[in-house]
Structures are given as structure tokens and as C-alpha cells.
């Protein structure tokens, strides 16, 4: 009888050990997932900020062109930021957002920026009254808004995933 009780206790301890090992493994996996999500989140605030800078600086550039104050440096600055947002090149240390919606909106915005630059050249040649610069600027502003909102949405999705992993980790530790 004593022998059966000893085996039962040993079996229970083994089961508890296996359960604890599984819970530790789950916790390690959750921590790895959290680290991956955090690495994706790092830099998104900078991307959101620079996407917003493009929106405002483009409006400034159009205003300057309308008032016949050329600013090639501002155009180059905008080119550099858009390139950094799209290709992670340049000196702004911008990260890539792995979000299809954001990437699509950024591509559309970048393509339209090229058209807007052509219109800026037309303003310089024939005056803003004879171009569609104001309307194009408004369209571009809305595109830039959509790009910023897509980046914010991506950031929020990652933050939600991290929060879920935190909750699961806490639950795992309580078990």
C-alpha cells in the first residue's frame, strides 16, 4: 500500500513538472513574440512624424511657389524623406512598415508627388493661375493624410498585439 502511494506521489510530481515545463516554454515563446512585435513597433513613431512632415512641407512648398519664392532645398528635402519612407535610405533612419495598406498609400502618394513637381515647374513657367497647382495640392494633402492614418493604424495594431501578449504572459505566470 505504501509502495502504491509512493508511486502515485512520484507520478503527480512528474505531471506537475511537465506542466511547469510547458508553462515556462509557453512563456518563453510569448516573450519572443513580444520582442518581435516591439522591434516592429520601434521606429513607427518616427515614420508617422516624417509622413506628417511631408504633408505640411508640401503645402509650404506650394505656397512658396504661388508667391514666386522658389525653394529647391525644400523639394530635395521632400524627395529625401519620401525616398526614406519608401526605401529606408537616406539619413533619416526610417524603418519599413510591413503593412500592405500603408505601402500602397505611400506609393500612390510618392507617384503623385512626381506629378506635383511637374506642376511646380509649370507654375514657374506660366504662373500659378494657369495651372492646377492648388487643386493638386489639395489632392496631395488628402493622400498624405491617408498615408499618415495608415501608419498610425499599423502602429495601433502592433500595440494591440503586444498588449494581448502581455495579458497572455501574465495569465501564464499565474498558472
What kind of feature is each model-predicted range?
Residues 10-38, 170-175:
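Extreme N-terminal signal-anchor transmembrane helix of membrane signaling/transducer proteins, especially
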Residues 38-76, 158:
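Juxtamembrane membrane-water interface segments immediately C-terminal to a transmembrane helix
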Residues 1-10:
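Short, Lys/Arg-rich, polar N-terminal cytosolic tail immediately upstream
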Residues 24-31, 57, 61, 83-87:
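Hydrophobic alpha-helical transmembrane segments of multi-pass membrane proteins
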Residues 59, 66-69, 73, 86, ...:
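Alpha-helical coiled-coil oligomerization motifs
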Residues 16, 20, 38-52, 96, ...:
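Short, solvent-exposed segments of well-ordered alpha helices
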Residues 75-130, 136-139, 143-146:
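Heptad-repeat alpha-helical coiled-coil/4-helix-bundle sensor or tether segments in soluble regions
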Residues 128-172:
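Juxtamembrane amphipathic/coiled-coil helical coupling segments that flank
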